[in-house]
Amino acid sequence: IEVLLGSDDGGLAFVPGNFSISAGEKITFKNNAGFPHNVVFDEDEIPAGVDASKISMPEEDLLNAPGETYSVTLSEKGTYSFYCSPHQGAGMVGKVTVN
């Protein structure tokens, strides 16, 4: 599945912001705007035993240009919350359910 970072109208959002995938399916996060974005999984809101640092981008790493991507494969079933660290305060958060 492809998830856009930034809506077409320039909004600070993940599109889609709430979605489901099958275990082992790849998620590709793609910068859709000229703003720097990243993808960080919330260590308190992912399945037990999953290491957030192994599935997140480093906090200082940003997708700066439109079209830049970050891909991750989630194999543990459960619900994962994620956010863009520069824009978390603006509500740029999302959730994926792995079935």
From Swiss-Prot:
List the InterPro entries: BlueCu_1, BlueCu_1_BS, Copper_blue_Plastocyanin, Cupredoxin, Plastocyanin
Q: Which Pfam families match?
A: Copper-bind
Domain called Plastocyanin-like: residue spans: 1-99
This protein's membrane topology, according to the annotation, is: Peripheral membrane protein
Cofactors demanded by this protein = Cu(2+)
Q: Which GO terms describe its molecular function?
A: copper ion binding; electron transporter, transferring electrons from cytochrome b6/f complex of photosystem II activity
**Localization per Swiss-Prot or TrEMBL:** Plastid, Chloroplast thylakoid membrane
Tell me which GO cellular component terms the UniProt record holds.
chloroplast thylakoid lumen; chloroplast thylakoid membrane
Write the record's keywords in alphabetical order, separated by commas.
Chloroplast, Copper, Electron transport, Membrane, Metal-binding, Plastid, Thylakoid, Transport
Residues annotated as binding Cu cation: 37, 84, 87, 92
Q: Does the keyword Thylakoid apply?
A: yes
Signal peptide residues are none
Q: What's the superkingdom here?
A: Eukaryota
What the entry lists under CDD domains is as follows:
Plastocyanin
Per the record's keyword annotation, is Iron-sulfur included, yes or no? no
Role of this protein: Participates in electron transfer between P700 and the cytochrome b6-f complex in photosystem I.
Family stated for the protein in its record: Belongs to the plastocyanin family.
* Stored NCBIfam families: cyanin_plasto
Name by which UniProt lists this protein: Plastocyanin
The organism is: Solanum crispum (Chilean potato-tree)
Which classification does the entry list for the species? Answer: Eukaryota, Viridiplantae, Streptophyta, Embryophyta, Tracheophyta
List the gene name.
Answer: PETE
